[in-house]
């Protein structure tokens, strides 16, 4: 799903918990993918000690449709 569309879909769900999988760990941040709805975003809090493939429970903390940003926390 396009990140801007995903941000629109997720915007009313800020504060909800989601099951997610870690898809990337880089110096710029840790990225996770939720499966329902299919969306990927940045894990902004709680990223220490996670590896690609780890399954986590994450909370949606922000969604910005204009910029296509989706942020999660553990």
Regions found by a protein language model. Give the residues of each.
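Structured C-terminal cores of nucleic-acid metabolism proteins
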Residues: 1-74
């Amino acid at each position: 799903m396009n990140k801007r569309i995903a941000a629109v879909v997720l915007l009313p769900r800020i504060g909800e918990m989601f099951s997610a999988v870690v898809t990337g760990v880089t110096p710029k941040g840790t990225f996770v993918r939720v499966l329902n709805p299919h969306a990927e975003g940045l894990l902004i809090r709680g990223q220490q000690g996670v590896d690609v493939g780890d399954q986590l429970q994450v909370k949606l903390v922000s969604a910005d449709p204009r910029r296509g940003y989706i942020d999660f926390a553990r």
